[in-house]
């Protein structure tokens, strides 16, 4: 390889991070590494007591002046702005025959959980939502308007957490639902656990089939097991579905414009169905049960391949990847790397903890 391999790591000095978001490395040709709540402070009457001033300030922070619109039979989840901690909180409404409410935690550990409120509309009307602490103090207040039924152009989401996230992100006219037209205008959906604490509650991607112009979709730490709703999103260029229990990815074979695909930390074992993805420049199946990577021989544009912590033992298919720049294959069963010998663009190879590889 005549010095083209700048880093060949055979023993534990360099490890790539577990979360690789299908990004390109810095190369001589490409220097890019590719890959309010407004606090409402009210004027306080100077003649008032210090106690009343404190109360006014509390309510200015705790009350959302915008009315939340919901629809009968279509629960949503909203963030309540409650602090972390073990203190118990309760959610209720001014008329629970019209709408009920319940607290949901983003984590089983209350010390770190973000508390959300699920609103369950029963019949049309108006109520006030109250979130109270263990002493009965109101920490959050929200006006709720319940309308009878969703308009016909509403996206038929099956998952409350996903619907609630997209309602916040793409409901451009604040009418309480995401229309098919609105969702078709969305180009990026990025859901990390650290950015959307309810990601663990997302179980169903139904409805995303209407995101026809979606180019980037990142789903981290969800409970999704079926990616079939993504099969028609042919404009997708970057797809990350990591740390989930998906096993079947055959429906992704239609996504012929994909350039970056990250399936790290999933339960997949077979990637042979990805043969149509000839535009991929980055593929990550890190920490999966994949054992055969021969499908990559058809991915002539591939520059970055991440197969660490898999059962892969044969990398002969990589010999066809004339544009490959990086191969990360730590903790695999690889025993022969002769397939790499003629890859003139290969600059980075990581083979830490490959016990079958002779020194």
Where are the model-predicted features located?
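Sec-dependent N-terminal signal peptides of Gram-positive bacterial secreted proteins and lipoproteins
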Residues: 1-23
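N-terminal capping/linker segments that flank leucine-rich repeat
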Residues: 22-27, 34-57, 66-78, 87, ...
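Asp/Glu-rich intrinsically disordered low-complexity tracts
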Residues: 24, 29-32, 37-38, 43-50, ...
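Non-cytosolic beta-sheet module surface loops
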Residues: 80-84, 121, 157, 220-221, ...
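Aromatic sugar-binding surface patches on proteins
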Residues: 109-116
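Conserved structural position at the C-terminal beta-strand
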Residues: 131-133
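Glycine-centered tight beta-turn/hairpin loop motif at sheet-sheet or coil-to-beta transitions
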Residues: 135-137, 222
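Concave beta-strand-loop units of leucine-rich repeat
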Residues: 188-203, 213-225, 235-246, 257-269, ...
């Amino acid at each position: 390889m005549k010095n083209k391999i700048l880093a060949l790591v055979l023993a534990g000095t360099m490890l790539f991070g577990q979360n690789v978001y299908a990004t390109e490395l810095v190369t001589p040709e490409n220097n890019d590494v590719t890959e309010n709540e407004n606090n409402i402070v009210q004027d306080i009457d100077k003649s008032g007591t210090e106690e009343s001033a404190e109360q006014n300030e509390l309510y200015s922070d705790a009350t959302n002046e915008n009315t939340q619109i919901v629809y009968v039979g279509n629960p949503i989840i909203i963030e309540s702005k409650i602090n972390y901690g073990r203190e118990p909180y309760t959610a209720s409404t001014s008329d629970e025959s019209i709408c009920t409410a319940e607290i949901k935690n983003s984590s089983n550990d209350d010390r770190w959980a973000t508390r959300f409120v699920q609103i369950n509309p029963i019949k049309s009307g108006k109520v006030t939502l109250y979130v109270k602490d263990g002493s009965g103090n109101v920490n959050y207040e929200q006006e709720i308007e319940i309308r009878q039924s969703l308009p016909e152009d509403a996206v038929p989401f099956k998952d409350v957490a996903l619907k609630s996230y997209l309602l916040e992100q793409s409901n451009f006219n604040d009418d309480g639902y995401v229309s098919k037209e609105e969702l078709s205008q969305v180009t990026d959906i990025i859901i990390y656990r650290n950015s959307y604490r309810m990601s663990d509650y997302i179980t169903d991607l139904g409805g995303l089939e209407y995101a026809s112009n979606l180019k980037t979709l990142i789903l981290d730490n969800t409970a999704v097991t079926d990616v079939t709703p993504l099969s028609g999103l042919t404009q997708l260029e970057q797809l990350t579905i990591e740390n989930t229990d998906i096993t079947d990815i055959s429906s992704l074979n239609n996504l012929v414009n994909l350039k970056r695909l990250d399936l790290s930390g999933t339960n997949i074992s077979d990637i042979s169905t990805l043969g149509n993805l000839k535009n991929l420049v980055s593929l990550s199946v890190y920490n999966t049960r994949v054992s055969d990577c021969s499908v990559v021989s058809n991915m002539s544009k591939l520059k970055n391949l991440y197969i660490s912590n898999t059962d892969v033992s044969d990398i002969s298919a990589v010999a066809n990847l004339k544009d490959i720049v990086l191969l990360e294959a730590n903790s695999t069963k690889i025993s022969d790397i002769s397939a790499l010998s003629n890859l003139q663009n290969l600059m980075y190879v990581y083979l830490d903890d490959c016990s079958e590889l002779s020194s």
